[in-house]
Amino acid sequence: DKIDPVHYAQKLDIRPWTVQVGGLVNKPTTFDIDDLLKTMPLEERVLRLRCVEAWAMAVPWTGFVFRELLKQVEPKPEATHVRLETFYQPFTAQGQLAFWEPWPYVEGLTIKEAMNELAFLATGIYGHPLPKQHGAPIRLVVPWKYGFKNIKSIVKIELVNYRPATFWNTLQGLEYDFTANVDPRIPHPRWPQTQEKMIDTGDIRPTLPYNGYGDLVAHLYS
């Protein structure tokens, strides 16, 4: 049900909002979201979004390149991965009351993925600030990966020297791979990934490796 998030997300208070960036860095910093909006080099990018459930769309995001934030904290050489964490407010987001699920939502990238030019932190969509249901006030956009990797409402970014445990990979690892690159050759256990349905037109199209961004990211996996 895609209507539920629109309703329930409105309970989330997104001001004040800070993003704590630390771990294996020389300059751990807590950033206020409004300071980031004033100081980071914002740009608009139209990027494809491919859900693991085989629907897709193109989205005009506003935000900045992830590595521009990471440069400010100076990652240490031993950092191999980036762990991202969303808010934990179970009485606001009542799904988080499910004690058998590994809340808060966590995702992770390799440091090479996070430093790639295509990895993006979005603060806006369609020319407006992110709505709460889309991950306000700041979310990850990694368009060569399935949508569940694009963590929303980020509060913490930690550079680590291990592969972090992530929400869906922990919950159902056979269905949700940690790397989760879009790949038509690898089916989901319950459906193929060879095709995708465009959510705006209903058109059925072939799935492209890396969601069409192979020229920019395939070298990360060679």
Language model feature labels by segment:
Residues 1-222:
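Structured, non-membrane catalytic/scaffold regions adjacent to prosthetic-group chemistry
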